[in-house]
Amino acid sequence: MTAQSQVLKIRRPDDWHIHLRDDDMLKTVVPYTSEFYGRAIVMPNLVPPVTTVAAAIAYRQRIMDAVPAGHDFTPLMTCYLTDSLDPAELERGFNEGVFTAAKLYPANATTNSSHGVTSTDAIMPVLERMEKLGMPLLVHGEVTHAEIDIFDREARFIETVMEPLRQRLPGLKVVFEHITTKDAAEYVRDGNELLAATITPQHLMFNRNHMLVGGIRPHLYCLPVLKRNIHQQALRELVASGFSRAFLGTDSAPHARHRKEASCGCAGCFNAPTALGSYATVFEEMNALQHFEAFCSLNGPRFYGLPVNESYVELVREETTVVDSIALPNDTLVPFLAGETVRWTVKK
């Protein structure tokens, strides 16, 4: 990374966790990612979910059809794990270069996850096959038992699911996605080379007070939900330390405005337009800009065993105002930090 006083030049980053949706929403949101990122790990929680090689190939084509001319972008597809998934289908997809990884959603943990896994025992043959193949398992790390408080679900997942699973399958490569707690930050930090984490901009920039004090801010509502300040600070300290197994994963998750601003609003922040500048702001605040490029562009490829991108992007330190909304055919999208003044923007 080269840093002049007002410009950051880094290798083209990748987004290791994104929701691109489908149909009109897909066509609207893809360019915000393909413009700045070389690759993205695309979540498979469509309706119906992406559980076959054929479905992944078709979805990948729909994504590519939405990439504007001149954008150099490769979607990396994932398989949605279900209790009934055939290990042979997963292996075929991985060997043919269709599936980069597989996604474990505990049933009903987040948007469109009702088909998710009821227990890791139910998919042990699949996980054993993944361990053998060296195929990464991407984990939404929350338990979903009704009696467990929503703010405790990540920490409880580590104790009851993640650690027993990694003990049982010590060769399994695992990405603990969108970590939100001090517990998870310490667990990943103290883990071995087969355990990594993605972290979103919203969990680095905000805590639950920002979402709940002085009025509910539905566009900060995502899952896993924002936690206490102590957890936010632990995440910030982890990335500022230059820890090499944490990397950029926006979890950008668009929903139309009427689905967010509702009596029962959807979870997800559409942060693709503003994420890169948001991360830069956090690293600057932590006096850690020397680690910014590794977090965005180097750590992820190293963990996945992929080459780093050859091209570069530049971020400029100048105040700009984020647009209030982005048009959809029958509604609008409200981007993360809508209407706010931001410090860093990507040079176009």
From Swiss-Prot:
What does the record give as its pathway? Pyrimidine metabolism; UMP biosynthesis via de novo pathway; (S)-dihydroorotate from bicarbonate: step 3/3
Q: Which residues form the signal peptide?
A: none
Q: Does the keyword Hydrolase apply?
A: yes
The cofactor note from the UniProt entry for this protein is: Binds 2 Zn(2+) ions per subunit. In vitro, shows higher activity with Co(2+), Mg(2+), Ni(2+) and Mn(2+) than with Zn(2+).
Q: Which Pfam families match?
A: Amidohydro_1
Q: Which residues bind substrate?
A: 19-21, 45, 140, 223, 255, 267
Q: Which GO terms describe its molecular function?
A: dihydroorotase activity; zinc ion binding
* Name the record gives this protein: Dihydroorotase
